[in-house]
Amino acid sequence: MAQDGVELEKSVRRLREKFHGKVSPKKAGALMRKFGSDHTGVGRSIVYGVKQKDGQELSNDLDAQDPPEDMKQDQDIQAVATSLLPLTQANLRMFQRAQDDLIPAVDRQFACSSCDHVWWRRVPQRKEVSRCRKCRKRYEPVPNDKMWGLAEFHCPKCRHNFR
């Protein structure tokens, strides 16, 4: 039972990161329960728009509310949390930044050799991949020492830096 709660929490955080924190934790939890942690179904329901009736059901879902105080003091839950602590601590900063909508991003250059197309894209720092718009292949970024086209100009008159 507690393992299901941990998996649900991971799914909720993944969903919120996928939608850049625009989905509230309560709504994400209710949708994950409703669709059985099926990210495709949840994504479709969010994209196509949740019906007004379903929105009222989601806001009234008692399971999506914050856990009661006695649950926070439960020894079984504490034991599971302790056993999963190394995994959680390694990802805690990333999850907190995703929740605060502060996912670190970097500007990277991508190049497609098959269609001779080059583009720049701002991507999350932990997931630096992009898809070519012409041939739809996924590419890793060009290595930092091989990038071209990035420059910075310091204007001596207005003292503004242009990138």
Curated annotation (Swiss-Prot):
Residues 51-75 are annotated as: Disordered. This is Shiftless antiviral inhibitor of ribosomal frameshifting protein homolog. PANTHER family: REPRESSOR OF YIELD OF DENV PROTEIN (PTHR16135), SHIFTLESS ANTIVIRAL INHIBITOR OF RIBOSOMAL FRAMESHIFTING PROTEIN (PTHR16135:SF2). It comes from Rattus norvegicus (Rat). GO terms for cellular component: cytoplasm; nucleus; P-body. Transmembrane segments: none annotated. A motif (Nuclear localization signal) lies at residues 121-137. The keyword ATP-binding does not apply. Inhibits programmed -1 ribosomal frameshifting (-1PRF) of a variety of mRNAs from viruses and cellular genes. Interacts with the -1PRF signal of target mRNA and translating ribosomes and causes premature translation termination at the frameshifting site. May exhibit antiviral activity. It is found in: Cytoplasm; Nucleus; Cytoplasm, P-body. GO terms for molecular function: ribosome binding; RNA binding; sequence-specific mRNA binding. Residues 102-150 are annotated as: Interaction with PABPC1. GO terms for biological process: defense response to virus; negative regulation of translational frameshifting; negative regulation of viral genome replication; regulation of translational termination; response to interferon-beta; response to type I interferon; response to type II interferon; response to type III interferon. It comes from the Eukaryota. Interacts with PABPC1. Found in a complex with PABPC1 and LARP1. Interacts with ELAV1, MOV10 and UPF1; the interactions increase in presence of RNA. Binds to ribosomes. Interacts with GSPT1. InterPro entries: SHFL. Belongs to the SHFL family. Keywords: Antiviral defense, Cytoplasm, Nucleus, RNA-binding.
